[in-house]
Amino acid sequence: MKVINHIKEIRTSKAITQVQMAEDLQITRQTINAIEKNKYNPSLELALKIAKYFNVPFEELFYLEEEE
């Protein structure tokens, strides 16, 4: 199974740049980019911080994609 996220969609709908989000969460823009491209899964702590940052339920940001 693969973890998929909706961070980019939510971030852009709120007109937040990767740079601004990275500064607010005290991580690098490259980390945000890698997470959005599903190349890196954030730690549980960071995933929860992102959900809190956007004020959305964790399940709205991340879900498991079933393999065929």
Regions found by a protein language model. Give the residues of each.
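Short amphipathic helical patch at the helix-1/turn junction of helix-turn-helix
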Residues: T12, Y40-N41
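DNA major-groove recognition helix of helix-turn-helix/homeodomain DNA-binding modules
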Residues: E45-E60
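Short alpha-helical DNA-recognition segment
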Residues: I16-T31
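Alpha-helical residues within the helix-turn-helix
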Residues: T12, E23, K52
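A short, Lys/Arg-rich alpha-helix, primarily the initiator
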Residues: M1-S13
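Short, charged recognition helix plus adjacent turn
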Residues: F62-E68
